[in-house]
């Protein structure tokens, strides 16, 4: 079976409408996760988790919908060398996590925020 995505404008409207409705939240995650993961739900972080945001950028090229990824730098840390969506940590001047995602996307892949239509 081949799954074909609708054109980008139509897909954008579908995503926006879906984001306006109730999302399945934790219950959907619980249905899909392995039993072994449930043991970790009550663990506490040593420090408060850092707020961060990513941008799932969709664009059309040669009739196909695409999304860019980045490869993180190699360093001594848990995210070293990972393939990831553009994004990063919240900074107070961002004011919102959407602004964080837009700022980080511009820093990491050079797409200016005025070139992005935020769906949600």
Label for each model-derived stretch:
Residues 1-84, 89-120:
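N-terminal leader/linker segments that precede catalytic domains of diphosphate-processing enzymes
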């Amino acid at each position: 079976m081949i799954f074909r995505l609708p054109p980008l404008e139509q897909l954008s409207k579908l995503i926006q409408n879906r984001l306006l409705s109730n999302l399945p939240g934790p219950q959907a995650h619980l249905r899909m996760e392995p039993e072994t993961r449930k043991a970790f739900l009550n663990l506490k972080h040593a420090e408060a988790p850092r707020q961060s945001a990513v941008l799932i950028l969709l664009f059309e090229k040669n009739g196909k919908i695409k999304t860019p990824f980045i490869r993180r730098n190699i360093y001594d840390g848990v995210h070293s060398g990972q393939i990831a969506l553009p994004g990063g940590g919240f900074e107070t001047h961002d004011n919102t996590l959407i602004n964080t995602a837009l700022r980080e996307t511009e820093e990491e892949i050079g797409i200016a925020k005025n070139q992005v239509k935020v769906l949600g």
